[in-house]
């Protein structure tokens, strides 16, 4: 399941992108959980690293997409960002915040699906498996590829990484 954030201030355009996501899901069999935001500040302020892909408009009222991406990158360097914009001059700036790509409005379904496929391939390549380990009342997330061996000692497990 791909966790996707859709950040677009124009409700009509946000609906169109949502339809594209649903169409892509039906055609590819890929499942999405989509969270919609109507401005950059809604996603950036208090951002939690829970998304695989963010589709984000650049020109928005309160916080533009570039500023939102800068704030998001402070917390999450892994999330894939694809900018959707009317202005091609933002493309170079988009790469400065680690955007995977950008799409010019009006977005065709073909262009959208190509960018989304590329993003999903990147998500699949970085997919890892984690164990959640509770130690001394605190939950820890441990990447299974970092474990060398596990030792059992008097009903306790010791993970060697």
Region locations from a protein language model:
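Short, flexible loop segments at the rims of nucleotide/cofactor-binding pockets, characterized by
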Residues: 32, 58-60, 135
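Non-catalytic signal-transmission and effector/linker regions of two-component phosphorelay proteins
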Residues: 1-5
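Acidic di-acidic motifs
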Residues: 8-9, 86
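Helix N-cap/capping motif at the beta->alpha junctions
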Residues: 36-42, 65
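Two-component/phosphorelay signaling modules centered on CheY-like receiver
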Residues: 10-35, 74
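CheY-like receiver
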Residues: 45, 51-125
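Conserved sequence signature across two-component system core domains
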Residues: 7-8, 37-39, 54
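Conserved binding/recognition cores within well-folded domains
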Residues: 114-161
